[in-house]
Amino acid sequence: MHPKVLIIMTTPYSKSDSSRTLDAYFHFWEKDRVAQVFSRNWLPNKGHCEQMYQITDSALLRKWLHQSDSVGKIYHYDEMSDTDGNKVLSDNSTVGFGYKLGAKHLPIIEILRGMLWRKKYWCTENFLKWLDGYKPECIVYNFSNHLFTQQIALFVAKRFNIPIVAVIGDDYYFNDRFSLSPAYLYFRYKFKKLTEQVLSGNCSAVYCSDKIRDKYNNFFGINGKTV
């Protein structure tokens, strides 16, 4: 029997999205041993997970505006879509515009999103109950430039004293550029600090190329592998 894995990435599994690579990792895994936390406002598809937990920007915004206390939705396998594709859940036009703006991944947008994704908003009693019921034994973290996904990975790893395996496909950590923009400098500072926490201690990584592998392994002193 395989260890219980918790995948943390922004998009849920889909054959038509970049997340389809997850099937290569977990195709033969027992479905009750794989769960995922994701943030996109998509209806998840049936795939490698028996259950998923969704936290969206719009739910956090409504809580931040005191319009709703409900943050986080649990999807069991029979509630997921039978057909592949990224079906967007209904949101108002303002929220929809916010998602389009957020897709640009500008430093100022990620900083503002980081304010929205404060722990007191996403770390709800419902989320903790779901985590404790699942009891993950390992985190698979899809490396990205989102500050909030790093924070969630670190929180869960500490709560259960479990390792993090980072899935890394680029050398974004090393791609500093000259800038006088306070937003860019602050974002890079926060991103690099969180990345250093993720890749320190009880962590390993998988890479898409030997070049990327050597860069991270040598810099962080980890023993990741190319897949």
Report residues per predicted region.
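Histidine-centered beta-alpha loop that forms part of the nucleotide-sugar donor binding/catalytic region
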Residues: 10-11, 144, 167-172, 227
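Conserved nucleotide-sugar donor-binding subdomain of glycosyltransferases
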Residues: 77-138
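Membrane-proximal helix-turn-helix segments that form the acceptor-binding/catalytic region
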Residues: 129, 151, 155-159, 185-205
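Active-site proximal beta-strand in glycosyltransferases
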Residues: 155-175
